[in-house]
């Protein structure tokens, strides 16, 4: 379980716009706060959509 999410890590869930999940695909807000973003990236919870595993994220580059 992700400490910031009510579902299993990597699973689907519904969460608010303040979602801070690290691996969860948030279907309700269509956001994905993924591991490709560096720890502490404030923009991740603001709409970062990761297309796949990467060292960089479009919102944090």
Curated annotation (Swiss-Prot):
Belongs to the metallothionein superfamily. Type 1 family. Residues 1-29 are annotated as: Beta. Class I metallothioneins contain 2 metal-binding domains: four divalent ions are chelated within cluster A of the alpha domain and are coordinated via cysteinyl thiolate bridges to 11 cysteine ligands. Cluster B, the corresponding region within the beta domain, can ligate three divalent ions to 9 cysteines. One of its GO terms (molecular function) is zinc ion binding. A divalent metal cation 2 binds at residues 7, 13, 15, 26. A divalent metal cation 4 binds at residues 33-34, 44, 48. Residues 30-61 are annotated as: Alpha. GO terms for biological process: cellular response to zinc ion; negative regulation of growth. This is Metallothionein-1. The modification N-acetylmethionine is found at residue 1. Pfam families: Metallothio (PF00131). It comes from Canis lupus familiaris (Dog). It comes from the Eukaryota. Metallothioneins have a high content of cysteine residues that bind various heavy metals; these proteins are transcriptionally regulated by both heavy metals and glucocorticoids. A divalent metal cation 6 binds at residues 37, 41, 44, 60. The gene is MT1. A divalent metal cation 5 binds at residues 34, 36-37, 50. InterPro entries: Metalthion_dom_sf, Metalthion_dom_sf_vert, Metalthion_vert, Metalthion_vert_metal_BS. A divalent metal cation 7 binds at residues 50, 57, 59-60. GO terms for cellular component: cytoplasm; nucleus. A divalent metal cation 3 binds at residues 15, 19, 24, 29. Keywords: Acetylation, Metal-binding, Metal-thiolate cluster, Zinc. A divalent metal cation 1 binds at residues 5, 7, 21, 24.
